[in-house]
From Swiss-Prot:
One of its GO terms (cellular component) is ribonucleoprotein complex. Gene3D superfamilies: 3.30.230.10, 3.30.70.240, Elongation Factor G (Translational Gtpase), domain 3, P-loop containing nucleotide triphosphate hydrolases, Translation factors. Keywords: Cytoplasm, Elongation factor, GTP-binding, Nucleotide-binding, Protein biosynthesis. The lineage of its organism: Archaea, Methanobacteriati, Thermoplasmatota, Thermoplasmata, Thermoplasmatales. This is Elongation factor 2. Belongs to the TRAFAC class translation factor GTPase superfamily. Classic translation factor GTPase family. EF-G/EF-2 subfamily. GTP binds at residues 28-35, 94-98, 148-151. It is found in: Cytoplasm. It comes from Thermoplasma volcanium (strain ATCC 51530 / DSM 4299 / JCM 9571 / NBRC 15438 / GSS1).
Length: 732
C-alpha cells in the first residue's frame, strides 16, 4: 500500500469523529507562497517525499500550472496529522492567488471552515490578500495567519530581530483591521489574530521551517536565534528543529473549528431553509445519520471518468450506489466515490457529514448545485464572486467537423469553471467565451486545444462594456403594437450603496423573494424611499425595477411580462446591446385594455421594453469600461519607464511610495489598455518589475471616445452603426 493510500486508510478511521476533522483552505496574494506551504504540509503528513516538497508542487498538478508557476485550480488533499496523542484528518484546499482565477477561491470557501492566510513578509498585505480575506469572512470561515519568506527580510533587507518584529506588528495589524471590517459581527473580536495566543506563525515555506509562541516555549528558539540560523546558512538545521508542518498544523488544530462546531453557526448563513426541518437540524449538528445534503463546489472533467463533482457534505452519509437529487436537474446515482489528493482520487466506500467528497455519477451537477437525498430540498445560497468577466473572445472550430464537439467542450468548461461565461450561437458557428482576464482565457484556450485536441480560431480579445444613465429620464410612454396598452417608466442611476448591497448578496437576484420584508428594510437603509421599496418587483444584475402605481386594473396579470421586458433591456442596453449597470426603473403609470386577448406577450413586452429604452435615451446613456487597479514594484531607476508604460495605456498613477531603492506605484488602467501589458512592462523595465492587479469595477468611457467605441461594438454585432434615439421608441 502506498503512503497516500495508507493515509486515506487512517483517514477513514477518523471521518466519523467530526471533532477530529478540519476542513481548511490556504489563501494569499499571488506568489506569497501558498502552494509551497501546501506541499510542505502534505510532505510532513507523509503524502510525498520531503525532498520534493516545495519543488514538486503536488497541488499544482495541471500542466499549465506547472508551466506558468501559478495555481489555477483549487486543489484538494486529505491528510492525517498527529497532535497531543490523537490523529486528526485535515482536508486542505490550495487556492489560486491570481485575480483571474478568483472564482475558484469563492467556491473553495464554501467547502472549508477555517483558512490559513499567507502573507509575504517583504510585500505585506496586498490587494488580493484583502479580497481573499473578505471572501473567507463572508462565508463565516475563521482565519489564522502565516507570515512567510522571513529569510528574505534577513538576507535581502538585512533587518535585525527588532526591525523584523516591527514589520510583523504592521502586517498583523493590517490583517486584524480587515477582520474587523469584514468578519461577521459576532466574531469581529474573537477572530482577531495575535502572536500571544498562537494564531500567528512565522517562517519560510520554501525552506520548510516555522516558529510560533507555542513552538518557542517548546524549542526555546527565539527571533534572535532565527536571524543567526538564516545568516549562517543553517536553515536545514532550523527545519529539523522547527518543522513547518508540525507548527502550522498544530495551529490549525488548536484554533480552527471542526465541522460540527463550524456548521452550528455557518449553516444559517449559507442555507436559508427552515432550520427546524429534519435536514436543517441535521446540517446544524453535522449528523452523519441524517438526510444527505451536499454542495458541489467544483466540477473536474476527467478524460476517463467524465464529470467528477467535488463538494462539502454538510449532512448524512454518501455511499456507492446512493440515488441523489440534484437541484434544478433531476437525479443522479453515485457510481464511484473518492477522497482527493491533488490529481489522485483514492476510492472509498463512503463519506460522512463534515467531509469533502469526489463523486462520479452526478451528471447534471454544476459548481453551486445542491445535492440531496431529499427531493426539492431548499438549495444552498448562491456563491457570490466579487468580479465578473471583463474580456471576451469569439471562438470557432477550424474544421467544421469539430463544431458539435466544440459546443460540448464549451458546455463542459463553463460547468467546470462557472466564472467562464459561454454564449453559444449554433446558427453562425461563432461562440463567445468571457473570462476574468487575458490569462484566464489563455488557459481556457490551451485546455481546448491540448486537453480536448480541437483546433480553434479566435478573435482578438474584446472588452466587456456596460451601459448606464447619467441622470433621470421619463416618464416615457411605450405603446403596444396594437396601441391598446401603454406603460410609463422613469429611469435614473441607482445609488452606489444599493449597487454594493446587490453585489454583496444582501439584495438577491430575481423576482421571487422569500423574505421581502428584510429586503425592503435593506433598501430603505441604503437610501431608497420606503414607499418605493415596497414596490420592489425585480432585481436583474445591478439593476432594480419598482412598481409605484396605485390600483391599476389588470396590471397584476401583466407584471410577469413587464419583468420579462425589464430583464431583456437590462441584458441588452439601448446604446450597444451591452448589459446595463446600476439603473433604477420605476413603473409610474399604465393604461391597459380590459380584454386579456389584447394584452398578451406580443403586446405587453414590446410596450414595456420601448418605455424603458425611451426613458434611458432621455436620461443620457453612457458607456462604462472595466478598469483594473495595477500595483507595480520597480527599482528607482526604472520608475520613469514604468510610469510611461502606464500612461501610454490611458492609465492614471494614483499613488507612489518609496522604500530604499524600491518604488511602489498604484495605477488605474482601462482593461482595453491591459492587453499585452505583462510583456510590455517587463521589456520597458529590463525585467526588473513585480506587478499584480485587481479588477476595480467600471468607469465612464471618455466622452471623446464614446461614439467611436459604441460604433465599433454595434458593427461587430451586426447592428446599424448609430443607436436609436427617444423619438424612435416613441413612434414604435
Amino acid at each position: 500500500m502506498g503512503r497516500k493510500e495508507d493515509n486515506i486508510e487512517k483517514a477513514l478511521r477518523i471521518v466519523e469523529h467530526t471533532e477530529l476533522v478540519r476542513n481548511i483552505g490556504i489563501v494569499a496574494h499571488i506568489d506569497h507562497g501558498k502552494t509551497t506551504l501546501s506541499d510542505n504540509l502534505i510532505a510532513g503528513a507523509g503524502m510525498m517525499s520531503e525532498e520534493l516538497a516545495g519543488k514538486q508542487l503536488v497541488l499544482d498538478y495541471d500542466e499549465q500550472e506547472q508551466a506558468r508557476g501559478i495555481t489555477i485550480n483549487a486543489a484538494v488533499a486529505s491528510m492525517v496529522h498527529a497532535f497531543q496523542g490523537k490523529e486528526y484528518l485535515i482536508n486542505l484546499i490550495d487556492t489560486p492567488g491570481h485575480v483571474d482565477f478568483g472564482g475558484d477561491v469563492t467556491r473553495a470557501m464554501r467547502a472549508v471552515d477555517g483558512v490559513i492566510v499567507v502573507v509575504d513578509s517583504v510585500e505585506g498585505v496586498m490587494p488580493q490578500t484583502e479580497t481573499v480575506i473578505r471572501q473567507a469572512l463572508r462565508e463565516y470561515v475563521k482565519p489564522v495567519l502565516f507570515i512567510n519568506k522571513i529569510d528574505r527580510l534577513i538576507n535581502e533587507l538585512r533587518l535585525n530581530s527588532d526591525e523584523m518584529q516591527k514589520r510583523f506588528t504592521k502586517i498583523i495589524s493590517d490583517v486584524n483591521k480587515l477582520i474587523s471590517k469584514y468578519a461577521p459581527k459576532e466574531f469581529t473580536k474573537e477572530w482577531q489574530v495575535s502572536v500571544q495566543d498562537g494564531k500567528v506563525a512565522f517562517g519560510s515555506a520554501y525552506n520548510n521551517w516555522a516558529i510560533s509562541v507555542p513552538s518557542m516555549a517548546e524549542t526555546k528558539i527565539t527571533f534572535k536565534d532565527i536571524v543567526e540560523y538564516v545568516k549562517n546558512g543553517k536553515q536545514k538545521e532550523l527545519a529539523q528543529k522547527n518543522q513547518l508542518h508540525k507548527i502550522i498544523l498544530n495551529m490549525v488544530i488548536r484554533h480552527l473549528p471542526d465541522p460540527k462546531t463550524a456548521q452550528s453557526y455557518r449553516i444559517k448563513q449559507i442555507w436559508k431553509g427552515d432550520l427546524e426541518t429534519e435536514v436543517g437540524k441535521s446540517m446544524v449538528s453535522c449528523d452523519f445519520k441524517g438526510p444527505v445534503a451536499m454542495m458541489v463546489t467544483k466540477i473536474i472533467i476527467d478524460p476517463h471518468a467524465g464529470e467528477i463533482a467535488i463538494g462539502r457534505l454538510f449532512s448524512g452519509t454518501v455511499k456507492k450506489g446512493t440515488d441523489l437529487y440534484i437541484s434544478g436537474d433531476g437525479k443522479g446515482k453515485v457510481q464511484t466515490l473518492a477522497m482527493m489528493v491533488g490529481p489522485d482520487r483514492i476510492p472509498v466506500e463512503e463519506v460522512t457529514a463534515g467531509n469533502i467528497a469526489a463523486i462520479v455519477g452526478l451528471k447534471g451537477a454544476i459548481a453551486g448545485s445542491t445535492v440531496s437525498s431529499i427531493e426539492n430540498m431548499e438549495p444552498f445560497e448562491p456563491m457570490i464572486h466579487y468580479s465578473e468577466p471583463v474580456v471576451t473572445l469569439a471562438i470557432e472550430a477550424k474544421h467544421t467537423a469539430d463544431l458539435p464537439r466544440l459546443i460540448d467542450v464549451l458546455r463542459d468548461i463553463s460547468k467546470a469553471d462557472p466564472s467562464i461565461q459561454v454564449d453559444i450561437n449554433q446558427e453562425t458557428g461563432e461562440h463567445l467565451i468571457s473570462g476574468m482576464g487575458e490569462l484566464h482565457l489563455d488557459v481556457t484556450l490551451y485546455r481546448i486545444k491540448n486537453d480536448y485536441k480541437i483546433e480553434v480560431e479566435t478573435s482578438e480579445p474584446i472588452v466587456v462594456y456596460r451601459e448606464t444613465v447619467e441622470k433621470k429620464g421619463g416618464p416615457f410612454e411605450g405603446k403596444s403594437p396594437n396601441k391598446h396598452n401603454r406603460f410609463y417608466f422613469e429611469v435614473e442611476p441607482l445609488k452606489p450603496e444599493v449597487i454594493q448591497a446587490i453585489e454583496d448578496g444582501d439584495i438577491p437576484q430575481g423576482s421571487k423573494f422569500k423574505d421581502k420584508k428584510t429586503i425592503i428594510e435593506t433598501l430603505v437603509s441604503k437610501g431608497i424611499d420606503r414607499e418605493e421599496a415596497r414596490g420592489l418587483v425585480c432585481v436583474e444584475g445591478t439593476n432594480i425595477m419598482f412598481d409605484v402605481t396605485r390600483g391599476i386594473q389588470y396590471l397584476d396579470e401583466t407584471m410577469e411580462l413587464l419583468i420579462e421586458a425589464f430583464t431583456e433591456v437590462m441584458n441588452r442596453g439601448p446604446l450597444a446591446n451591452e448589459k446595463v449597470f446600476g439603473v433604477k426603473a420605476r413603473l409610474v403609470d399604465a393604461k391597459l385594455h380590459e380584454d386579456s386577448i389584447h394584452r398578451g406577450p406580443a403586446q405587453v413586452i414590446p410596450a414595456g421594453r420601448n418605455s424603458i429604452y425611451g426613458a434611458m435615451c432621455e436620461a443620457k446613456r453612457i458607456l462604462l469600461e472595466p478598469v483594473q487597479k495595477v500595483f507595480i514594484n520597480v527599482p528607482q531607476e526604472e520608475m520613469g519607464s514604468a510610469i510611461n508604460e502606464v500612461q501610454q495605456r490611458r492609465g492614471v498613477i494614483e499613488d507612489m511610495t518609496q522604500e530604499g531603492e524600491e518604488v511602489s506605484l498604484v495605477a488605474r488602467i482601462p482593461v482595453s489598455g491591459m492587453f499585452g501589458f505583462a510583456s510590455a512592462i517587463r521589456s520597458a523595465t529590463g525585467g526588473k518589475v513585480l506587478w499584480s492587479f485587481e479588477n476595480a469595477g467600471y468607469q465612464k468611457v471618455p466622452p471623446e471616445l464614446q461614439d467611436s467605441v459604441v460604433r465599433s461594438i454595434r458593427e461587430r454585432k451586426g447592428l446599424r452603426p448609430e443607436p436609436y434615439d427617444a423619438d424612435y421608441y416613441a413612434s414604435m
